[in-house]
Amino acid sequence: MQVTVEDLSSVKKVLHIEAPAEDVKKALDSAYAELKKQAKVKGFRPGKAPRSVLERLYKSDVESDVAGEIISDAFRDAIMETKLKIVGPPEIEPPAIVSDEPYKFDATVEIFPELSDLNLKEIELSKNMYKATEQEIENQIAMIRKNMSSLETEEEDRPAKEEDFVLIDYEGVCPDGQPDELRFTENFTMELGTGRILKDFDAQIVGMKRDEEKDFEISFPEDYFNKELASKQVKFHVKLKEIRKQILPELDDEFAKDLGEYETLDQLKDSIRDHLQQGYDRRSEQELDEQVFQALLNRVEFEVPETLIKHETASMVSEAERALSYRDMTFEDTGATKEDMEERYREPAEQQVRRYLLLDKIVEQENVELPEEELENAFKGMAESLRQPLEIVKKYYASDAEQMNMLRQTLLQKEALKYVKNLNEIKEVELELQETEE
């Protein structure tokens, strides 16, 4: 077998492969010999049909099968000889076999880029030190109180105002028909001012009294989440049946106890503070990681195989599709197609692939190893997240070598990132209050 490599780019090659004529002849002879044993040809006893007859009847199928075998074997040998680290399957258009001649074919492949050694030092890094504020804690408690509140009918005969809860019947009519959402709806509870349907809708109800009925028109904006109502003028008829006031629980130790995990209000506040701080700490670390990536990407240039970009894009699109499915939605419900989403995610997918390739290079260059305790911690984290016994998680990975290798590689990449950060001085930046509020 002969092979030459033609460079299309640093990550795309064409292998010009030639299998010798004797290999072709041997493969054809073997194929016809096997066919002769099995073929049932009219006028001949089993195993007695001459090759000329078999060629007349089965030549196309035999040569197609033989070409596939030669390509598979020769391509495998070519990869071993050239030592190319290919990405994904090759692109091959099998030519026809010509008897007694070498079999020549081209295989277009993508390969992993070869990154030059990286300078991992002298990277200017700063870490934003976010801190959970008392106001954020109070906001969280306010949300919990609201979720634990009850509603009481307002006995006073007064107009409805913002932050009231109201019980209404309503019906909407569009010029071109009635979307299901606008058909007569009875005993609908809503909080005024939140814009559950539309803030303009709430504004029309503010000022109404119990048992009052009202007709009004609302224009839905172009970007309204329900595309059936976007840009439409809708006539509504509303009857206000009750005004209800929200009764919040007292903010004391009993309030904390009712949540089932705390004995005092201070314990609840401490728990909220810890939870918020954990989120801020993760944010700080993610921002720091991104600084490392950007610094290293500025120090090395390399092409990314299209195969890897497409694979990562598909993964991101699938994740977005899965997230929407949890809300019983599809891409079409958001006004986008799958092709739109693929285009949207292509650039972030390429950046993510670059990060993976950088981390793999660091692992190789610096001989980064995975401490066994990190693997154990990963198993424990998954067991806790999935609410499964630790041994079940370990057994799953022990039975699936591919999944285990993927997990180890992911953890190794984290170790590589940690390695780079440990090589460089990190300046901690305490942020002012207004910078942490969102």
UniProtKB/Swiss-Prot annotation:
InterPro entries: PPIase_dom_sf, PPIase_FKBP_dom, Trig_fac, Trigger_fac_C, Trigger_fac_C_sf, Trigger_fac_ribosome-bd_bac, Trigger_fac_ribosome-bd_sf, Trigger_fact/SurA_dom_sf. It comes from the Bacteria. Its main location: cytoplasm. It is found in: Cytoplasm. It is an enzyme of class 5 (isomerase). GO terms for molecular function: peptidyl-prolyl cis-trans isomerase activity; protein folding chaperone; ribosome binding. PANTHER family: TRIGGER FACTOR CHAPERONE AND PEPTIDYL-PROLYL CIS/TRANS ISOMERASE, TRIGGER FACTOR-LIKE PROTEIN TIG, CHLOROPLASTIC. Consists of 3 domains; the N-terminus binds the ribosome, the middle domain has PPIase activity, while the C-terminus has intrinsic chaperone activity on its own. Its EC number is 5.2.1.8. Belongs to the FKBP-type PPIase family. Tig subfamily. It holds the Pfam family Trigger_N. One of its GO terms (biological process) is protein unfolding. Involved in protein export. Acts as a chaperone by maintaining the newly synthesized protein in an open conformation. Functions as a peptidyl-prolyl cis-trans isomerase. Keywords: Cell cycle, Cell division, Chaperone, Cytoplasm, Isomerase, Rotamase. Residues 163-249 form the PPIase FKBP-type domain. This is Trigger factor. Gene3D superfamilies: 3.10.50.40, Trigger factor ribosome-binding domain, Trigger factor, C-terminal domain. It catalyses: [protein]-peptidylproline (omega=180) = [protein]-peptidylproline (omega=0). GO terms for cellular component: cytoplasm.
